[in-house]
């Protein structure tokens, strides 16, 4: 909501500066409490950065380009997730503090670029800054419409993704005796597929099929992944199944964000904030449930996540049929 009032650029700028300060503190930390304060500061200053960034992409995109641009944003994040630990590990070989100082430098360069180069998207897209009071009735109307359905689907998708990711490392070790290297290869394949599909295919596919059908296919694939994991027999089959997992994530996440952006009109910031809250809530609950179920049976989390994904598929199918 704050980014709807004062603009996306200030929120993103503050967030990047927060990353810089937090990483510097991490590099200089000599006690647990310094680390704790640095992490808390990072969360306080940068928690809205991803939300404002998604809103910025929504502001700056036409409806036809929105899914493609959301996909490219997701691909860029996947590249960072894949390369960050790699370079961090290399730099840590020289000094444990060096990865943090390097990250702080990169974050500060990004901060300077945002301040000096990045235009304010709300002004560019013609949306006025919202200085007036919060319109609860307008928000309620949106949440009872398509935006509410999309938020439910975002929760379900994040819930299933987090649940599957959280227990798969244990599952493949307990069932097949995977080495840490084999587990790493699985996640490298997932990251690679995410980058390629989000970066090059999600947008064009959405333009051809429509957002609802693409989301429907993606969530159904998530259910197939969960059930198929119970039937896997070794390394190759796990790679294939989690390749499909990456495809389903690449199709659903950016398309859901793009659909929410379309439904938001001038309130992209607050709805993206709700989406972030739904996603974060699912990431708290899903690992707890998956871990509890895993203690009962190692296949039970997959069956449960598959059933939840099927519920999401049904919700999406009804949404597709009833909302034009």
What are these regions (language model features)?
Residues 73-115:
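Helix-loop-helix hairpin linking two adjacent transmembrane segments in secondary transporters
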Residues 212-256:
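C-terminal transmembrane helical hairpin of 12-TM major facilitator-type secondary transporters
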Residues 38-78:
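Cytoplasmic helix-loop-helix junction between adjacent transmembrane helices
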Residues 1-7, 197-210, 294:
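Helix-to-loop junctions at the C-terminal end of transmembrane segments
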Residues 22, 33-41, 236-244:
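Paired small-residue
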Residues 1-30:
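Conserved MFS/SLC helix-loop-helix module at the cytosolic interface between two early adjacent transmembrane helices
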Residues 167-182:
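Short amphipathic helix-loop junctions that connect adjacent transmembrane helices
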Residues 119-151:
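Juxtamembrane intracellular "pre-TM" segments in multi-pass secondary transporters
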């Amino acid at each position: 909501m704050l980014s709807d009032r004062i603009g996306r650029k200030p929120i993103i700028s503050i967030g990047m500066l927060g990353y810089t300060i937090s990483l510097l503190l991490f590099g200089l930390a000599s006690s647990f409490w310094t680390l704790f304060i640095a992490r808390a500061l990072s969360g306080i200053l940068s928690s809205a950065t991803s939300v404002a960034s998604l809103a910025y992409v929504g502001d700056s995109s036409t409806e036809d380009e929105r899914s493609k641009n959301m996909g490219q944003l997701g691909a860029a994040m996947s590249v960072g997730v894949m390369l960050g630990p790699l370079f961090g590990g290399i730099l840590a070989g020289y000094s444990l503090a060096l990865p943090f100082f390097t990250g702080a430098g990169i974050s500060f360069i990004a901060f300077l670029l945002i301040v000096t180069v990045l235009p304010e998207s709300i002004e560019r897209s013609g949306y006025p800054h919202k200085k007036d009071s919060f319109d609860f009735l307008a928000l309620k109307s949106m949440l009872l419409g398509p935006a509410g359905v999309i938020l439910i689907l975002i929760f379900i998708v994040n819930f299933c993704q987090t649940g599957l990711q959280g227990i798969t490392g244990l599952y493949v070790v307990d069932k097949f005796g995977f080495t840490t290297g084999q587990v790493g290869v699985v996640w490298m394949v997932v990251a690679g597929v995410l980058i390629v599909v989000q970066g090059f295919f999600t947008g064009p596919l959405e333009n051809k099929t429509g957002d609802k059908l693409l989301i429907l296919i993606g969530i159904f694939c998530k259910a197939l992944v969960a059930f198929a994991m119970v039937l896997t027999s070794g390394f190759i089959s796990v790679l294939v199944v989690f390749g499909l997992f990456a495809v389903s994530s690449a199709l659903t996440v950016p398309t859901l964000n793009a659909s929410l952006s379309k439904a938001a009109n001038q309130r992209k910031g607050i709805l993206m904030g709700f989406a972030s809250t739904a996603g974060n809530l699912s990431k708290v609950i899903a690992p707890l449930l998956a871990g509890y179920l895993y203690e009962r049976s190692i296949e039970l989390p997959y069956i449960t996540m598959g059933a939840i994904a099927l519920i999401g598929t049904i919700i999406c199918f009804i949404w597709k049929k009833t909302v034009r």
